[in-house]
Amino acid sequence: MKAIIFLFAVLTVVAIIIPIISGEPNAGPHAASIDLNEIMKKITPDLLKMLDDIKTKIQG
């Protein structure tokens, strides 16, 4: 059950963060695919650290 909640939280965070970083505040997740590779290169290290923090909080 925790894994499902964790996955949902991660997907939600990604769907919200990517359009903001891509510079389109009113854009939904669908609009982020234009420069998705560039964006992912920038945020992947931060995202991995954030996911690790979330995982450690969930695990105790």
UniProtKB/Swiss-Prot annotation:
GO terms for molecular function: toxin activity. Its main location: secreted. Residues 24-33 form a propeptide. It is found in: Secreted. Residues 1-23 form the signal peptide. The keyword Secreted applies. Keywords: Amidation, Neurotoxin, Secreted, Signal, Toxin. This is Myrmicitoxin(1)-Pr4c. It comes from Pogonomyrmex rugosus.
